[in-house]
Amino acid sequence: MAQYKVGMETKSKIIEVCRKLFYEKGYTETTYKDIASLVGIKDASIVYHFPQKSDIYSAVYSSAMGKCSEEVRSYITKNENKEYLAFMLYYYILGYKNWHDENYRRFMAYSFNMANSAPYTFYNDYFSRFDLVNVDEFMKENALKLRSCYFMDIGFNKDVGENFNYYSENYTFIEVSTHTLLMYAKIFDMPSELVNRA
């Protein structure tokens, strides 16, 4: 049991160190040697916990999204549209960080490059964090809408990241985020007043 605990602590430390390194240096520039040096382990120990470097990235990404989910959870109010409001707030927080922090933008840009056609996994993880709905049922009923949001989000945010100077010179964060959230409202057949109220 003690060995398992040490292993989990090492894994957590790898994720925390990589979050810092990916943020400061970028994913591609971070080496196993960098990670091992800061964690205080050998390269082989990293591979034991994360067979591929992309596995580390996935763990860091999931952890970062979990922190964002906690921020959202602290602001959700009782509302007949709480699922949608949580969804909007989640993306607003991510968008705010993406807009105002160059290192975060670089981290997210890599996420969009790694994105595949697995929105089910992403949204299952997202909605499970809030305990708002029966996830399987909600995913089944809204599969097309969720896929539309997922791929719209990847494309738009990738474009913002790649052309940030253009967007930041021509639009405010509020204009861009409101535009995005209004598109989500349209996809989910929600009244646009919800965006203005949120």
Located regions from the model:
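Short linear capping/connector segments at secondary-structure termini
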Residues: 76, 107-114
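Helix-loop "lid/cap" segments that line or gate small-molecule binding pockets
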Residues: 92-99, 110-113, 184
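C-terminal peripheral helix-coil segments that are non-catalytic and often amphipathic
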Residues: 128-140, 166-198
